[in-house]
UniProtKB/Swiss-Prot annotation:
Belongs to the TRAFAC class translation factor GTPase superfamily. Classic translation factor GTPase family. EF-G/EF-2 subfamily. This is Elongation factor G. Pfam families: EFG_C, EFG_III, EFG_IV, GTP_EFTU, GTP_EFTU_D2. HAMAP family: EF_G_EF_2_B. Catalyzes the GTP-dependent ribosomal translocation step during translation elongation. During this step, the ribosome changes from the pre-translocational (PRE) to the post-translocational (POST) state as the newly formed A-site-bound peptidyl-tRNA and P-site-bound deacylated tRNA move to the P and E sites, respectively. Catalyzes the coordinated movement of the two tRNA molecules, the mRNA and conformational changes in the ribosome. GTP binds at residues 17-24, 88-92, 142-145. It comes from the Bacteria. GO terms for biological process: ribosome disassembly. One of its GO terms (molecular function) is translation elongation factor activity. Keywords: Cytoplasm, Elongation factor, GTP-binding, Nucleotide-binding, Protein biosynthesis. GO terms for cellular component: cytoplasm. It comes from Baumannia cicadellinicola subsp. Homalodisca coagulata. NCBIfam families: EF-G, PRK12740.1-5, small_GTP.
Length: 705
């Protein structure tokens, strides 16, 4: 079966924003105007299509990135039907993993900002993720109908806070309750949408007289930016020739694709204004899959494969390649693997190669997802985003490809968890189900870890924040019927060293009969944080330790890394070289060398100036000025380091770095200090050394445990 929509008419886009910028409402309007939904679902009624998990409907926030497909031919039916695959991503910082994996497979992003709140801390996190994967983006300033809405202030914040180059292609006509429409700065026309039919029809009109000068100024700005990017247009401009709308749009599109500018539009999704023009901008300015070269996405490619795959996005005849970007559990069909096809095509029943795990897999059924509804399809082509049922051993970030042309696509980085809690099943019946449920959830979410503490025998779960863990425990109850008692949150400390040491380790038991003999010399040195957390080097010369015992040496070290030495926390950023030692013809064994390495590492670690590291959070507190003194005093008591303050519409925003261990219970304290008028956001920033007076308390707490 040939493809229905030419690939040039595809747009794979994400919709991204901070909490409450109106992201899900905007997506609902897109689905309404493109004819997917015949009735608009409102978030505050708990009926939004894209928020399909029970917890999302209760809390009114988006947790998982739902995928859906719609078609758009333009506000005035001026385009051929374009297929838009939309991924709606969460705005809460605990779910950054969802944003990260969406960014990896998208071609373009619509960033939504609130016209009142402007650029929020979470917007900056999402922006950094989009920069990392070089995703072209346009902005939509939403909620123009709200009290305090100010479009040009948000444009300025995009410039200052995100260090971007925003270029408005629209101006708002009026604001707050007087917001009536927008000015199209390319056409230089006013657009008004018909409220009687929920904004389906619209009219072009003349720009209001009082706005002509402002519109002319911003139109000129837009033309100059478009002209600077093209020698041909520059000549026309200097010769005072007329530059057509199409030429301006083509030049702006190229600048967006190169990530040089961010085009800005505005509207009010709730009042059905501006979303239709935003869809036109998606088609006119964001990339098709053919605008993104697959070769930039590759990790390990030999020259011959680059030839096969080069610009192969535009061709279904090229070898198949796809990236699995999300695993979800479905109550009816089991595992769903969401994947993005970069080249070629695949049909249900085809055999493909998982090049990361070096295993073959067979595609079972292939489904097109619309939020949580499924439509079964026979095949998918380059540019498609779909889900497969029946892939057994695929995890997030794996590449699926043609067995004859193996390729590995660029992988994703996942953050390490910063907070952990102990969970124990309430009944014996829950015990077995809990293990199954936790494994399923960990499979879906690479930023969620599960393990059993060897000393206490407790099951520990770790994630990106309290809300993250709360929702996972809630899902365990709803989806798997498991009731669990949850302990107090614990900080995920780490241990490391400051200096290099050399240390000998011996394990000798010789008391008649076969003995045990293992003898090693290790060099233990600190590594730069941020890369690999552990490296093992074999520097043995002349066979003083036979090769077959070296994996046991590595294992002995790794067991110590896991259990920690100073205070029982995992050890990171160390490089260990085994450079000397000896063995016994009869008595040496793997067990003896494992124990010798373990002894050497433990003693060496304590001599290498060990330190504890703790997660430091980037916190932003928004507070009315009257409470500034109390809030800052409290943050200082929590070992906070203040980075700066900025004015916002309701008072001040304080930026501060605070250790996670000091932030438990902060929400309640902040509420009581400010009579509920302040709010804060928090995200993981880095690991940093724990001050010596605090280290002692942590070590003592570990020993009593």
């Amino acid at each position: 079966m040939a493809r229905i929509t030419p690939i040039a008419y595809y747009r794979n886009i994400g919709i991204s924003a901070h909490i409450d910028a109106g992201k899900t409402t905007t997506t609902e309007r897109i689905l309404f105007y493109t004819g997917v939904n015949h009735k608009i679902g409102e978030v505050h009624h708990g009926a939004a299509t894209m928020d399909w998990m029970a917890q999302e409907q209760e809390r009114g926030i988006t947790i998982t990135s739902a995928a859906t497909t719609c078609f758009w031919s333009g506000m005035a039916k001026q385009f051929n039907a374009h297929r838009i695959n939309i991924i709606d991503t969460p705005g809460h910082v605990d779910f950054t993993i969802e944003v990260e994996r969406s960014m990896r497979i998208l071609d373009g992003v619509v960033m939504i900002y609130c016209a009142v709140g402007g650029v929020q801390p979470q917007s900056e996190t999402v922006w950094r993720q989009a920069n990392k994967y070089k995703v072209p983006r346009i902005a939509f300033v939403n909620k123009m109908d709200r009290m305090g809405a100010n479009y040009l202030r948000v444009v300025e914040q995009i410039r200052t806070r995100l260090s971007a180059k925003p270029v408005p292609i629209q101006l708002a006509i009026g604001a707050e309750e007087n917001f009536t429409g927008v000015i199209d700065l390319v056409k230089m026309k006013a657009i008004h949408w018909n409220e009687a039919d929920q904004g389906i029809s619209f009219t072009y009109g003349n720009i209001p007289t009082e706005m002509l000068d402002l519109a002319e100024k911003w139109h000129q700005n837009l033309v100059e930016i478009a002209v600077e990017a093209s020698t041909e247009l520059m000549e026309k401009y200097l010769n005072s020739e007329i530059i057509s709308e199409e030429e301006i749009k083509a030049s702006l599109r190229q600048l967006v694709l190169n990530n040089d500018i961010i085009l800005v539009t505005c509207g009010s999704a709730f009042k059905n204004k501006g979303v239709q023009a935003l869809l036109d901008a998606v088609i006119e300015y964001l990339p098709a899959p053919t605008d993104v070269s697959i070769v930039n996405r590759m990790l390990t490619v030999e020259n011959k494969q680059t030839k096969i795959y080069d610009n192969s996005l535009s061709s279904d005849k090229a070898p198949f390649s796809a990236l699995a970007f999300k695993i979800a559990t479905d109550p009816f069909v089991g595992n769903l693997t969401f994947f993005r096809v970069y080249s070629g095509m695949v049909s249900s029943g085809d055999m493909v190669f998982n090049s990361v795990k070096e295993k073959r897999e067979r595609f079972g059924r292939i489904v097109q997802m619309h939020a949580n509804k499924r439509e079964e399809i026979k095949e998918v082509h380059a540019g498609d985003i779909a889900a497969a049922i029946g892939l057994k051993d695929v995890t997030t970030g794996d590449t699926l490809c043609d067995p004859e042309a193996p390729i590995i696509l660029e992988k994703m980085d996942f953050p390490e968890p910063v907070i952990s809690v102990a969970v124990e099943p309430k009944t014996k019946a829950d015990q077995e189900k809990m293990g199954f449920a936790l494994n399923r959830l960990a499979q879906e979410d690479p930023s969620f870890h599960v393990w059993i503490d060897e000393e206490s025998g407790e099951t520990i779960i770790a994630g990106m924040g309290e809300l993250h863990l709360e929702i996972l425990i809630d899902r365990m109850r709803r989806e798997f019927n498991v009731l669990a008692n949850v302990g107090k949150p614990q900080v995920a400390y780490r241990e490391t060293i400051r200096v290099t040491v050399e240390q000998e380790g011996k394990f000798i038991r010789q008391s008649g009969g076969r003995g045990q003999f293992g003898h090693v010399w290790l060099r233990i040195e600190p590594m730069e944080p941020g890369g690999k957390t552990y490296e093992f080097l074999n520097e043995i010369v002349g066979g003083v330790i036979p090769k077959e015992y070296l994996p046991a040496v590595d294992k002995g070290i790794q067991e110590q890394l896991k259990s920690g030495i100073l205070a029982g926390y995992p050890i990171v950023d160390v490089r260990v070289a085994v450079f000397d030692g000896s063995y016994h013809e009869v008595d040496s064994s793997e067990m003896a060398f494992k124990l010798a390495a373990s002894i050497a590492f433990k003693e060496g670690f304590m001599k290498a100036k060990p330190i504890l590291l703790e997660p430091i959070m980037q916190v932003e507190v928004e507070t009315p000025e009257d409470y500034m003194g109390d809030v800052i005093g409290d943050l200082n008591r929590r070992r906070g380091i203040i980075n700066g303050m900025i004015d916002n519409t309701t008072g001040k925003t304080i930026r501060v770095q605070v250790p996670l261990s000091e932030m438990f219970g902060y929400a309640t304290d902040l509420r009581s200090q400010t009579q509920g008028r302040a709010s804060y956001t928090m995200e993981f920033l880095k690991y940093h050394e724990v001050p010596s007076h605090v280290v002692q308390t942590i070590i003592e707490a570990h020993q009593t445990k």
